[in-house]
Amino acid sequence: SLKNVPNLRNISCIISVPLLNEIWLGSEYYPEIYRVKKEKDRIELLGTLNLSNYADNPGFPRIFYEDSKHNLWVATTKGILVKPEKEKNLQDTKFPSMDITGIGEGKDGTLWIGTRKQGVYNAIVSSNLTFEKKGLKNLTTQTDKLVSDNIGAICIDDNGLMWMGSQDGDVFTYDPRTKKVE
């Protein structure tokens, strides 16, 4: 039983990883991801990814997101790691340390990253899956008329419209084509 795994008492995030035929579980208070799969009538622990092996001060996993190219993004309390589609290991993206609340992919392949108190970032992903400062655009209440900088969740709909829910009770959209907030 997984109840005997001490660091799995509180799970912060979970995702299916079909290419590996496994499920990933993020530990709330440890820099670890647990890899599991269901075998007949029991859940089997396949192994642990210690995030400290991939980044200095990696933080704890909070959000898993798979993009259209099957790269698996792991937002932590300290930044973002990624598992490239054809790789086994995670790598550090060099995203600045901030409180990340959501990740979504735009129609153009850029990533949208919601944050608590710092608005939303639009990130051009380099070929080696890192973020460079020149490829990061920060949208805020001051610069882009967002309704709130305190973003709780984001998603991108089929038309490319970004939806945001704030931790102040607001729901609003941003259209990357027209740069309009509604």
Residue ranges and their predicted role:
Residues 1-182:
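Carboxylate-rich, polar loop motifs that coordinate divalent cations or form catalytic acidic clusters
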